[in-house]
């Protein structure tokens, strides 16, 4: 059985679209947008490993927060991240999500909860939820204006936002074809688009791959966010081309 962690692999992400948020969930993977670089770095404290969010602007590095999760999202003006408040058990923590204004240096507390992490942002809506590790994320759309949350779905691996839509993939330890779902920005209107593993979502097109378990080969497809206009982009291949979002 082939084991696969359903997250995007890669060293860095770059984006310059106006006010578009870019989300990262890994350690030591830089996200650069509007000349601002943000990264979650591991450090050791009192014999245990923790994480901190570091920003680099005009060549100068600044530690935004220590004892955080590895998840953050930024548009080059704002950084949303999750800080650990206290340990609840050997695998659970109480976390608080903060907003950091890069221009003013102001911190704003957004929402807190058990094992809360940041998964994405559309501007008005922050996508966050409970990290249940192997069982994925229990995802909510948090209305930053009205300060209330809407449950979206569970067992989430990745969240991608483009235009007026949100797409989520399903978390699994094994390579396979699992539901990819579509939502409106406010977290409503859930609809299953297809089965597979999500690669990227841009210009209202979803890129994903399916697995052939007989020989563990992959085929990349694209379709509209509503599941229509499905088209194969590759044949059965052993490695997914990087241009489709898999590094």
For the regions a language model picked out, list residue spans one by one.
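Sec-dependent N-terminal signal peptides
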Residues: 1-3
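Sec-dependent signal peptide cleavage junction
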Residues: 6-19
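Surface-exposed loop/turn elements that mediate protein-protein interactions on large endomembrane-trafficking
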Residues: 17-24, 46-65, 90-112, 134-153, ...
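Repeated scaffold domains used in trafficking and secretory/extracellular systems
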Residues: 23-32, 66-76, 113-123, 153-163, ...
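Residue position within the beta-strands of beta-propeller blades
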Residues: 39-41, 80-83, 126-129, 166-170, ...
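Short, conserved, GDST-rich strand-edge loop motifs in beta-rich repeat architectures
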Residues: 42-45, 84-92, 171-173, 211
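Intrinsically disordered, low-complexity segments enriched in Gly and acidic/Ser/Thr residues
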Residues: 156, 169-181, 192-203, 207-218
């Amino acid at each position: 059985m082939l084991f696969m962690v359903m997250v995007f692999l890669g060293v860095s992400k770059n984006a310059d679209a106006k006010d578009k948020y870019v989300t990262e969930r890994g350690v030591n993977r830089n996200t650069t947008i509007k000349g601002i670089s943000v990264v979650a770095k591991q450090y050791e404290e009192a014999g245990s490993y923790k994480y901190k969010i570091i920003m680099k602007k005009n060549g100068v590095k600044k530690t935004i927060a220590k004892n955080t999760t590895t998840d953050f999202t930024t548009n080059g003006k704002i950084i949303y991240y999750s800080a650990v408040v206290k340990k609840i058990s050997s695998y659970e923590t109480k976390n608080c999500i903060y907003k950091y204004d890069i221009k003013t240096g102001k911190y704003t507390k957004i929402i807190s909860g058990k094992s809360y992490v940041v998964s994405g942002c559309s501007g008005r809506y922050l996508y966050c939820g409970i990290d249940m590790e192997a069982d994925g994320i229990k995802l909510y759309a948090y209305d930053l204006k009205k300060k209330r949350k809407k449950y979206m779905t569970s067992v989430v691996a990745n969240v991608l936002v483009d235009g007026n839509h949100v797409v989520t993939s399903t978390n699994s330890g094994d390579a396979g074809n699992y539901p990819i779902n579509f939502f409106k920005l406010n977290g409503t209107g859930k609809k299953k688009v297809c089965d597979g593993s999500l690669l990227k979502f841009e210009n209202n097109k979803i890129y994903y791959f399916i697995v052939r378990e007989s020989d563990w080969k992959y085929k990349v497809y694209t379709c509209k966010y509503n599941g229509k206009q499905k088209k194969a982009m590759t044949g059965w291949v052993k490695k997914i081309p990087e241009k489709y979002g898999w590094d």
